[in-house]
Amino acid sequence: MSKAKAYYAHSMRKYNSSEEAEEFAFIQKHCRGEVICPNVNLGELGDIEHYLEVIKSVDCVYATEFRGYVGRGVFDECTFALKNKIKVFVVRKDHKGKFFVQEVIESIETNRFNFISFGCLIAK
C-alpha cells in the first residue's frame, strides 16, 4: 500500500515560525506519508486556484486554526477538499498543549469581512 499524501493548510501568519514547524512535525508523524507545506514546498503561487489544484492530488488535508478560526485561504482549501470528497482533519491543542486531530465534517463562514477569522471548522 502506498503512503498517504497530505496537504498542510495553515495561516500565512504562521509561516516561518516555531508554531509552523511544530505543527508540521506533528502532521508528518500523524500522516506517515508525504506532507505538502505550501510555504516550504510551493512558495507564492498567487491565485488560490493554484493551491486547489495541488489539493486535488492529495489524500487528505490537515488544517490548523488561528485563534479558533481559519482565514479565507484555509477556509477555501478545506471547503474545496470537502466538496471533492477529500478528507479534512483539523489539528488542535488540548488544555495541556498536546496536539490532537479531529475529522472535519463541515466548514462554516463566520465573518466574510475579516479574512483572518473568515470561518470555522466543524469536527465530528
Where are these regions (language model features)?
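Conserved catalytic or regulatory cores that recognize and/or transform ribose-phosphate-containing ligands
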Residues: 1-124
